[in-house]
A protein has these predicted regions:
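Donor nucleotide-activated moiety binding/catalytic core segment of transferases
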Residues: 75-90, 96, 153-163, 310-323
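N-terminal Rossmann-like NAD(P)+-binding subdomain of aldehyde/semialdehyde dehydrogenases
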Residues: 1-87, 377
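Short His-Asn-centered micro-motif
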Residues: 92-95, 119-120, 153-155, 174-177, ...
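Conserved NAD(P)+-binding/catalytic subdomain of aldehyde/semialdehyde dehydrogenases
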Residues: 143-251
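NAD(P)-dependent aldehyde/semialdehyde dehydrogenase
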Residues: 234-352, 360-371, 376-384
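Short, surface-exposed connector motifs at secondary-structure boundaries
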Residues: 113-116, 145, 164-171, 344-350
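Short, surface-exposed basic-aromatic patches at helix termini and helix-loop junctions that form
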Residues: 107-110, 136, 186-191, 368-369
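Conserved small-residue-rich beta-alpha loop and adjacent elements
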Residues: 74-138
Length: 384
């Protein structure tokens, strides 16, 4: 880590790369081959690293940025004319999802931009490992072009430094919730600077109870695996991680579905062995704090299992306790899937769905669109 002082007296640490090099770099076209080659090499390095295998979030990132996946992603974009990145992207990642900075960086690189990322002071082991692997791959001579497009900086809560980078940026990628977004927007930027902001959002899943009740053991296990990916990756910190599970069906079918589904999810969690004791403790602490601070919780089930379920007195108030994490899910029931609309608003990012036919899915999508939801995806694809 190299302490730096600019001529205007601003101080920050260059954790990786050089600010000067990034400022002097030229933008590339989207999905440029040097970037694709670097990310493919990074994916390989992560997947082969022995320490990384004990860090499921890092392994997930490495798998996501493998070249074959990025090639599929590139195939979704068709450009009618030659295009290049906007220039410099200044990233302000969140603190609650440690490896989010890596995903943000990949997006900046794939869009052809030079990137300066502000890292938080949170010293997570997977962040240190990720940066070390990024550095090791960038150090290879064949990746010099990409090396000059990446700089990771760290500094305290200093608006002067944030304003400095904001003034240089052509794009700002701002994570961290409403307060962070509003604060960053109060800082001066160039007249053509574009902000990509991720404000406070939450997500939920809608599950067809009859589908779960009638599924085979293999189908149930596969559904539980898909739900686990959405609900437990990043310790339920991602905006697209479901915080609420809404069951569609009559009282009996919902009861039968719950009795099958949650033990299957617990079995997946036990098999994967990724839930640490500290996660269980944090879940209990957060739940107790919620019970003290609100009057909406009426019952809690499965607190000693991998999946704690919370019942509330008024399901329309579910977002009041949407900060619960580490495998804690508010539950609600609707008889008709379209009734989900009363639980949706513009703070809902993702609605995951499971077990519905195409006709019902179309009606659900219409309800979600009216509610202001960004997207409707199959359970298991919420983090894509």
């Amino acid at each position: 880590m190299t302490p730096s002082r600019h001529e205007n007296g601003l101080e920050f640490d260059e954790v990786s790369g050089s600010v000067t090099a990034v400022l002097e770099s030229a933008p590339l076209r989207p999905f440029a081959d040097p970037v694709m080659s670097f990310l493919g090499a990074l994916s390989t390095a992560i997947m082969k690293d022995r320490d990384s295998r004990r860090m499921p979030d890092l392994v997930s990132f490495g798998y996501w940025c493998r070249r074959a996946n990025l090639e599929r992603m590139a195939g979704r974009y068709v450009f009618d004319a030659p295009v290049v990145g906007r220039g410099l992207a200044f990233h302000v990642p969140p603190t609650n999802v440690p490896l989010n900075f890596a995903y943000s960086l990949v997006c900046g690189l794939l869009s052809g931009n030079g990137n300066i990322l502000r890292m938080s002071s949170v010293d997570a082991i997977e962040v240190r490992k990720a940066i070390a692997l990024i550095d090791s791959v960038l150090a290879r001579e064949e990746h010099k072009a990409v090396r000059d497009m990446v700089c990771i900086v760290r500094y305290g809560h200093d608006d002067r430094v944030s304003a400095y980078f904001s003034g240089l940026a052509n794009v700002r990628i701002i994570w961290g919730g409403d307060a962070t977004v509003l604060h960053m927007r109060s800082l001066p930027t160039g007249p053509r600077t574009v902000d990509v902001a991720f404000a406070d959002r939450t997500s939920l899943a809608l599950i067809n109870a009859a589908h779960v009740s009638k599924s085979s053991e293999d189908e149930l296990r596969a559904d539980a695996e898909r739900f686990y990916v959405d609900g437990y990756t990043f310790s339920q910190n991602a905006c697209s991680s479901p915080r609420m599970v809404v069951w569609a069906g009559d009282e009996r079918s919902v009861a039968d579905a719950k009795a099958r589904f949650w033990p299957a999810v617990d079995a997946v969690a036990l098999k994967r062995g990724e839930i640490e004791p500290i996660h269980s403790m944090n879940r209990l602490v957060e739940l107790c704090q919620t019970l003290v601070a609100t009057n909406v919780v009426t019952d809690v089930h499965g607190i000693q299992s991998a999946s704690a379920r919370v019942s509330i007195s008024d399901v329309t108030r579910w977002q009041e306790i949407a900060s619960l994490r580490f495998g804690t899910f508010t539950e609600a029931t609707v008889r008709n899937p379209r009734d989900i609309e009363r639980l949706l608003d513009q703070k809902v990012q993702t609605l995951g769905v499971m077990g519905f036919g195409s006709d019902v899915l179309s009606r659900i999508a219409e309800s979600a669109a009216r509610g202001g939801v960004d997207r409707v995806v199959p359970v298991g694809a919420a983090l894509n």
